[in-house]
């Protein structure tokens, strides 16, 4: 059984305000996985990177790439999860009847997160893995940094809603999150800030 994630702003989302000029986070929707006294960790879930699932899996094991092709997942983009450790691979997935749980953290709202090669291989090899995203890198904040940025209006917290990740097209996730906050994306203007790189 997956262990639980820490409380605070996580699990949840941070919706970037339009005035957030940092190119790593402008227009981003960040899934917050950890938030505690030592800082915070999250993943941008709406920024496709230049490589695909097939590129990553083919680099690990050609049979995994072939399974992804057979499942119609080979051309899915790998997301840019954030500027910290951009070579580190993470897996965000919706646990299902055959999806592995070993090595994963349950975030709630039907989402789980892991970062091991074993988890990725088990997920791709499972009979019906369900939806998953691969992400490279993460967003990290020093102690009290994200609280300061939220206070300045650079980010607006949104409760965790798993459908935003897997049921809303990537290019519509930020706009959908803004609308769920009860705001009009065209008129959503607040302060600035940024996460640490």
From Swiss-Prot:
SUPFAM superfamilies, sorted: VC0467-like
Superkingdom as given in the UniProt entry: Bacteria
Family: Belongs to the UPF0301 (AlgH) family.
UniProt cross-references to InterPro entries, sorted A to Z: AlgH-like (IPR003774)
PANTHER family: UNCHARACTERIZED PROTEIN YQGE, UPF0301 PROTEIN YQGE
Protein name: UPF0301 protein Adeh_3962
Pfam family, one: DUF179
Regions that span the bilayer: none
A cellular-component GO term for this protein: cytosol
């Amino acid at each position: 059984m997956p262990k639980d994630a820490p409380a605070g702003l996580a699990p949840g989302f941070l919706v970037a305000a339009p005035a957030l000029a940092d190119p790593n986070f402008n227009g981003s929707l960040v899934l917050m996985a950890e938030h505690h006294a030592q800082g915070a960790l999250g993943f941008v879930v709406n920024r496709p990177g230049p490589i695909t699932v097939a590129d990553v899996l083919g680099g690990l094991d050609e049979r995994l790439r072939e399974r992804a092709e057979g499942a119609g997942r080979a051309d899915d983009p790998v997301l840019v999860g954030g500027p910290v450790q951009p070579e580190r691979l993470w897996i965000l997935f919706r646990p299902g009847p055959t999806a592995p749980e070993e090595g994963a953290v349950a975030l709630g709202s039907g989402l789980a997160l892991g970062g091991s090669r074993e988890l990725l291989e088990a997920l791709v090899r499972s009979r019906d893995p369900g939806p998953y995203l691969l992400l490279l890198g993460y967003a990290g904040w020093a102690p009290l940094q994200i609280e300061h940025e939220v206070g300045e209006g650079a980010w607006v917290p949104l409760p965790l809603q798993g459908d935003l990740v897997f049921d809303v097209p990537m290019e519509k996730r930020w706009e959908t999150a803004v609308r769920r906050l009860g705001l009009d994306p065209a008129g959503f203007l607040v302060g600035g800030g940024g996460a640490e790189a």
